[in-house]
Amino acid sequence: MKFFIDTADVGEIKKALALGLCDGVTTNPSLVAKTGRGFEDVLKEIVQLVPGPISAEVTATDYEGMLREGRHYAKFGSQVVIKVPLTVDGLRAVKTLTDEGTKVNVTLCFSPVQALLAAKAGATYISPFVGRLDDISQDGMAMVADIVQIYRNYGFKTQVLVASVRHPVHVLEAAKLGADVATIPYSVIEQLAKHPLTDAGLKKFLADWEKVPKAPK
């Protein structure tokens, strides 16, 4: 399973790259707003850093606007993937952009049937939002399981990109279900590396090492 980092913070991207845990990047307007920078400046910098897929989200909600923004952002680099919402106009934009050779990530997916439509339209990625479904007492990972099964049933090439990841269990379940990608906040990447028994074991090893006779200097 590939790891994308879900951020527009260049510092976090650099840290994930140094760990070998950044196969790609996903951004959205909310993440860009947190940086206090203009989106195009951020995108240009990310393109210089990351060789893998970089999702750049349109803010237009109409078909023509999505095409205009998508075509513009696609010029920033061959690794740029245009991110569009799962709406009727969004699906239409997916079809057009895909026919033009542009990769598309369909975002804000909350049902397996929506994911089926995105695959039929030719999406490169589908982004089911597991955390937001969990927030309203629905089962986000059950949605992912259904999407993975449907795509396998019919041989769709669209990759399942699990989004709205809130904690390590989401990552674990995505991997168990066979999702292609999980896009993960840097804070969750750090949590993945942590375990209390690892900390306790390291503390014990270091304490025991202090008891080992040392050669005179």
UniProtKB/Swiss-Prot annotation:
The keyword Transferase applies. It catalyses: D-sedoheptulose 7-phosphate + D-glyceraldehyde 3-phosphate = D-erythrose 4-phosphate + beta-D-fructose 6-phosphate. Keywords: Cytoplasm, Pentose shunt, Schiff base, Transferase. The active site is at K83. Belongs to the transaldolase family. Type 3B subfamily. Transaldolase is important for the balance of metabolites in the pentose-phosphate pathway. This is Probable transaldolase. The gene is tal.
